[in-house]
Amino acid sequence: MQTPTLGQLATENGAQVVGDPDLAIVGLAPLDQAGPGELSFLSNPLYLQQALDSQAGAVIVSAADLERVRAEGRADGRNWLVARNPYVCFARVAQRFDRAANTDTRTGIDPRATVAPDAVVPASCYIGPNVVIERGARLGERVRILANGYVGAQAEIGDDSLLYANVSVYHDCVVGARAILHSGVVIGADGFGFAPDIGATGVEYVKIPQTGRAVLGNDVEVGANTAIDRGAMADTVIEDGCKIDNQVQIAHNVRVGAHTVIAGCAAVSGSTRIGRFCVIGGAANFSGHLNIADRTTVSGGTSITKSITKPGGHFTSVFPFLPHGEWERNAAIVRGLTRLRERVVALERRLRGQAAGSQPSQD
């Protein structure tokens, strides 16, 4: 990759250079570690002092933060890349410097791979060692499937998608264009569906065949060891632009709306529908058969047990952490709340009775 100049990066990202546009940018680094020739960014005014002290060759800033730097008398003689959204600008510049994405130009099928004769694998694809592609599977252009991947019968993988090592896409499932599936992802395993048959000797759980699919839209990224189960009859659907972190469980028949982000270890129970542009914190969990409105934010560790109908809300159910002894004392109080409520209700009744008895006679 040719080393870009600050001016080139500005042109590519709709930003403005304050300083030397011919400065060669050789890499990216945090504010407190960057050196000459490296680009960093400031997206939070709390780190303004780090930006002032940084040895970075240039810093991506907003116009407002650059004015704060000027107010400190520290802007002159330095290089700034002024962007409407410094964090987004940094992300796009980082894509340019992503060596893993930009240097892997391999194509072809590794001789150790197994590809069904009727599978569609364009010449622009790369199929790594020990990959198995079953009958009728269809890959788009420039798909890369790294070592030990599995694509089931009749499954589809869209153009420019990347499946890291040990990713499994089960039969009939669909992965859209430009997907990134990290190692250990499983798309389309059976949903957790069993019918309880109660007999004289106990309960037998009868497996319900999961005949739906798991369908991922375009530009979806799924983190390591996440499972997205196939539907029982209808499909499980992850819409365009969703970003799902590591170790997330998406159960059968769930639908996640476009451009929703879900952080690590969250779990969504069956048939729940999450709206568009939602933000789900780590270890949040959802009961089944719920409807969650668009643009809902759920804090990490929160349990959602009822539908949310109003868009744009922020919900939290986590008790803040405390020193252990204080937490135990509070827990003891919580255990006694039912008895305390009963006492308060009884006292209120007595007071109302006393008030009624003390009123003057109307005779």
UniProtKB/Swiss-Prot annotation:
The lineage of its organism: Bacteria, Pseudomonadati, Pseudomonadota, Betaproteobacteria, Burkholderiales. It is an enzyme of class 2 (transferase). Pfam families: Hexapep, LpxD. One of its GO terms (biological process) is lipid A biosynthetic process. This is UDP-3-O-acylglucosamine N-acyltransferase. GO terms for molecular function: N-acyltransferase activity. It comes from Cupriavidus necator (strain ATCC 17699 / DSM 428 / KCTC 22496 / NCIMB 10442 / H16 / Stanier 337). The keyword Lipid metabolism applies. CDD domains: LbH_LpxD (cd03352).
